[in-house]
Amino acid sequence: MKSMLVVTISIWLILAPTSTWAVNTIIYNVGSTTISKYATFLNDLRNEAKDPSLKCYGIPMLPNTNTNPKYVLVELQGSNKKTITLMLRRNNLYVMGYSDPFETNKCRYHIFNDISGTERQDVETTLCPNANSRVSKNINFDSRYPTLESKAGVKSRSQVQLGIQILDSNIGKISGVMSFTEKTEAEFLLVAIQMVSEAARFKYIENQVKTNFNRAFNPNPKVLNLQETWGKISTAIHDAKNGVLPKPLELVDASGAKWIVLRVDEIKPDVALLNYVGGSCQTTYNQNAMFPQLIMSTYYNYMVNLGDLFEGF
C-alpha cells in the first residue's frame, strides 16, 4: 500500500504543472503593434485577472487575495526577438518581478526586494520553472513609486516619458543584457508598470497611450492622481448608493485642478477594474434618479474651483 502511494505521488509530481499559481501567459508584441492590438492586449489581461462573479455598477472587480490562480504573467515581446515576462499579483496587478532569456537557454529572474517569504519563492519558480536553467539577478530596491522615481533620477514619474517606442527600447536595454544600471532598470519598470498594470486598471490611462500611440508623452496630473487613488476610488464606487458616492471624492483633472466626484457615472468612464472590496455592492442604478445629483456635482465643482481662484487674492 505504501509503495503504491509513493508511486502515485511520484507520478502526480511528474505530471503536475510547473506552477499552479499563474493563469495563462498574456503575450503582447510591443515591437509590432497597433492601437487595436494594444486595446486587445489590455482587455485580455483584464479578463484573465478579474473575478467573473464580482462587479459594481457594471465595473469588473479583481478577486480577493485567497483566490487561485494568484498570479498573472505578461510576456512583452520587443524588437529583435527581445522578450521580458512580468509577474503580477492577480488581486491588484502589482508587478512583483520579471524574467528574461539569458545567455544560452537560461532564464534570469528579477524580484523586487519588498517581495518576501513564500511569495518570493512563487515568483522564482513561476517565472523560471526549470531549476537547472534558473539564474538570479535581484532588483536591489522596492516596488514603490517614490523608490522607482528616485532610482530613475527624477523627482516625479511625470518626467519619465511613456510610449510604445520607449517601452520597446527599454526592453532591449534589459533583455539578455549582462549588465545594466539601476537607473535603466527603474526607467523600464516605471514605463512597463504604467503601460501594463495602470492601463489595465484605468481606461483613462489606456486612452492616453492610444491617443499618443506613435509618440512619446509625459503622464499628466490626472494620470498620476488616478494611480495614487485607485484603492480610494474602488471603495467609493463599491460603497455608493444608487450611484451616489458616500462622500465627495477629491481628485485632480488633467490640468491639475481639483475635480470633485459625487457620482459613479462621473468616474466610471475612466475606470476599467476595481480593486477588491469585501461585501456586496450595487450592480446597476436608475439613471433618471441621478439628474439632481448632476446639477449638484456641476455646482460643487464650480464653487470649489472658484474658491481656489480667489484664494490667492
Curated annotation (Swiss-Prot):
Active site, UniProt feature = Y94, Y145, E198, R201
Superkingdom, according to UniProt? Eukaryota
Give disulfide pairs as residue numbers. Answer: C56-C281, C107-C128
Which EC numbers characterise this protein's activity in its record? 3.2.2.22
Q: Which reaction does this chain catalyze?
A: Endohydrolysis of the N-glycosidic bond at one specific adenosine on the 28S rRNA
Q: Which stretches of the sequence are propeptide?
A: 286-313
Annotated GO MF terms = rRNA N-glycosylase activity; toxin activity
Q: Which UniProt keywords apply?
A: Antiviral defense, Disulfide bond, Hydrolase, Plant defense, Protein synthesis inhibitor, Signal, Toxin
Q: Tell me which Gene Ontology terms the entry assigns under biological process.
A: defense response to virus; negative regulation of translation
Gene3D superfamilies hit by this protein: Ricin (A subunit), domain 1, Ricin (A Subunit), domain 2
InterPro entries under this entry? Ribosome-inact_prot_sf, Ribosome_inactivat_1/2, Ribosome_inactivat_prot, Ribosome_inactivat_prot_CS, Ribosome_inactivat_prot_sub1, Ribosome_inactivat_prot_sub2, Shiga-like_toxin_subunit_A
Would the keyword Signal turn up in this protein's UniProt record? yes
> Which Pfam families is this protein grouped with?
RIP
- Which residues constitute the signal peptide according to the record? 1-22
Q: Where does substrate bind?
A: V95, S143, S197, R201
Q: What does this protein do?
A: Possesses antiviral potency. Inhibits viral infection of plants (tobacco mosaic virus). Inhibits protein synthesis. Releases both adenine and guanine from Escherichia coli rRNA in vitro. Activity on guanine is 20 times slower than that on adenine.
- PANTHER family (UniProt xref): PTHR33453, RIBOSOME-INACTIVATING PROTEIN
As a miscellaneous remark, the entry gives: Depurinates genomic RNA of immunodeficiency virus type-I (HIV-I) and bacteriophage (MS 2) RNA. Inhibits the replication of HIV-1 in human peripheral blood mononuclear cells with IC(50) value of 14 nM.
Subunit info?
Monomer.
What family does this belong to? Belongs to the ribosome-inactivating protein family. Type 1 RIP subfamily.
In Swiss-Prot or TrEMBL terms, this protein is called Antiviral protein I
Give the originating organism. Answer: Phytolacca americana (American pokeweed)
